Amino acid sequence: MRAKQTVVVSLGQRVCGAVSLNPPGVKSSVKKAAKRRVLLQRSAPDIARAVRQMAGDGGEAKRLPKRPFHGEVEENSSAAVDGNVKIQPGKKAPGERRGKENSAAKCTGLTSGSAEAKMEQSVHGSQTTDPSVFFDEDSNHVFPVEQFFGNLDVVEDYPRRTPGSKRMTRREYRSMHYYAKEDSEEEHL
């Protein structure tokens, strides 16, 4: 980074020039290139460890499935999809998509090992969620109240008013809230 600075020499002459704010002999592009080189030389586990350390990860990485970095090789997932087809490391399969759902499916697919187990998981997964429960936002469906609030027959119906109280007429209400004007001595004179 450079800043323009005017220097007044002892003879009264002014000299204009650019003065570097960096240490002498070091340009900012050189610093950036050195940082870039250091980051590229780090391995993926080192970077992940540093990120977890900075973020204060409380062991969540052990509970959650690992999502590969963009440049990381996914040899196990390509071999599990089809054992006969070999894909070059670093390239994605044509049907492979990015996202949380797909990465979770890859992790479960790696542990199951066979296509039959994957089919059982997908069939079991479709049975747990009932699509009839979720309606469109724009539809006029009546929502099942019991599903959200439980059995409403158990809840007692409370009357609005207690049976001992009677309805007050307008005249009675006004007479209760009437404030008489104070008599002033000046008006009586």
From Swiss-Prot:
Top-level taxon of origin: Eukaryota
Pfam family of the protein (one): UPF0688
GO cellular component: nucleus
Record bears the keyword Transmembrane helix: no
Subcellular location field: Nucleus
Chain segments carrying region Disordered: 53-137
Main location as per UniProt: nucleus
Compositional bias of kind Basic and acidic residues: 59-73, 93-103
Coiled coil recorded as keyword: no
InterPro entries assigned: UPF0688
Entry keywords, A to Z: Nucleus
Similarity remark: Belongs to the UPF0688 family.
Identification of the protein by name: UPF0688 protein C1orf174 homolog
Organism, as annotated: Danio rerio (Zebrafish)
